[in-house]
Amino acid sequence: MRKYNPRKIKNKVNIPIVLHKANSTIPFVQGTVDYKNVALLRKYISAEGKILSRRLTRLTSKQQRHISTAIKTARIAGLLPFINQ
């Protein structure tokens, strides 16, 4: 049996953990999701311009699909950027 050697254990790297947004339960009405409603869509986009995941937004899968298609349509229409600079 091997002996415990503390030198072989590498130092752990501190990786920042992204937590859920506080008060992210925004009243989500199905009829308000539209590609022209840029103020609502910006809440579901990260600072880099990426669509946030369901874990962060706490949406159902159906709501997430509606949001993602609206964001993609708004990007094609030129209302939202593909990449934030």
From Swiss-Prot:
The keyword rRNA-binding applies. GO terms for biological process: translation. The keyword rRNA-binding applies. Keywords: Chloroplast, Plastid, Ribonucleoprotein, Ribosomal protein, RNA-binding, rRNA-binding. Its main location: plastid. GO terms for molecular function: small ribosomal subunit rRNA binding; structural constituent of ribosome. It is found in: Plastid, Chloroplast. It comes from the Eukaryota. SUPFAM superfamilies: Ribosomal protein S18. Transmembrane segments: none annotated. InterPro entries: Ribosomal_bS18, Ribosomal_bS18_sf. Part of the 30S ribosomal subunit. Belongs to the bacterial ribosomal protein bS18 family. This is Small ribosomal subunit protein bS18c. The gene is rps18.
